[in-house]
Amino acid sequence: KMSRTASEGLALVKENKGNISLIEVNCETDFVAKNKDFIDFCKELSEINFTSKGDLNKINECKMSNGNPVKDNLVNLISKIGEKITIRRANFYDNSKGINFFYVHSAIEKGIGKIISFVKLEGVLKGKNEDIGSKIAMHIAASNPLALDKDGIDKNIVDKELEIIKAEITNSGKPAEVADKISKGKISKFLNDNSLLNQIW
């Protein structure tokens, strides 16, 4: 089972006194992602993450409600369900330095879905302008930016995109000086489209 790809699964978010637990657990099929045992396991991990604060090694060693560590319960769940299951990633955000906001896309129940976006904002006041946080979180889920700003986009991704753009222009038979101008315009558009602060709102 370990050689198979676990590309389905669930993302979970839980809030406790303004602190946020985010966790992603993968399985092989959408069918298993809807399985009660799988969902219950994920929910308990989401709670455990408040203690382990996003550290996967700590999560694996934590005892669950049945008294067994997460790693043993994971092995048992894999054996019972018959699919590869992996705890892909976990994050924890405390309630200091701003207010935490999140958005759950395609929620199957509260705090559980396929995609969860998260944003922490400073200068936002509860009850005043806090709806901006929820709107930004929703925008992130819809537009999937690669980074906060242009400089944050991985150089390898930019270089690869530039390579693709140049190959397309070269194949179209445009003169070099025109090709250079077009490639600059296209890479600028790519950077704007993929950085949150430059995306169209």
Residue ranges and their predicted role:
Residues 1-201:
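N-terminal assembly/interaction segments in proteins that build large macromolecular machines
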